[in-house]
Regions:
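Interdomain/boundary linker segments immediately adjacent to catalytic/signaling cores
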Residues: 1-40
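Catalytic core segments in nucleotide and nucleic-acid processing enzymes
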Residues: 32-181
Length: 181
């Protein structure tokens, strides 16, 4: 990965990430997720996905709530975010399938295989989309930038701005705000 992060400095001890704007959005997403390890128990991942959904679906309200709720619903799509997938989240996905919804489980890249095994155990591996958070972030940056004729880095900065606003609205630990340079 190209770039670095510093979780001990920055304004209010925010997550400070120095990125090379010439590297790929996958690299940026990996650095953001890596920087959250040990600091948040899924809070960063949750609000990052919420920020992307808000940015992508401007005409559809994306409720902002504490990360413990753990999911977003947009139309028939239910996005579950988990830094460490468990049977509990897979049971929620199974409930979504039974209700005729399409669950998407977003997990860190290194947790994809574990999530797949748990989905098989629940019998929903064919109905559930398991996507790495890193791929979700990167693909949305690429697609939004392409649709709007913008550069990838400016779209990332917009998403981070939305993320910080959403985080400040519902969380008490503002050290989880992200500063990208």
């Amino acid at each position: 990965m190209t770039g670095n992060f510093n979780t001990a400095s920055g304004e209010n001890n925010q997550i400070l990430i120095n990125l090379d704007p010439h590297t790929s959005p996958v690299n940026w997403a990996s650095l953001i997720i890596e920087s959250a390890k040990g600091r948040s128990t899924g809070v960063v991942e949750h609000h990052l996905v919420g920020a992307i959904l808000q940015r992508r679906f401007k005409g559809i309200p994306v409720p902002n709530r504490h990360a413990r709720v753990g999911s977003y619903t947009v139309s028939r799509l239910v996005c579950h975010i988990s830094a460490a997938p468990s049977r509990n989240v897979l049971q929620k996905c199974a409930t979504n399938v039974k209700a005729g919804l399409h669950p998407v489980l977003l997990v860190p890249r290194e947790q994809e295989n574990r999530a797949g095994v748990l989905a098989q155990d629940e019998g929903i591996d064919k109905e559930l989309s398991i996507i790495s958070i890193e791929a979700f972030v990167a693909l949305n940056i690429i697609e939004l930038a392409t649709e709007e004729s913008k550069d990838f880095f400016s779209v990332l900065q917009e998403i981070v701005q939305i993320y910080n606003k959403r985080l400040a609205e519902v969380e008490t630990d503002l050290s989880l705000q992200i500063q990208v340079r």
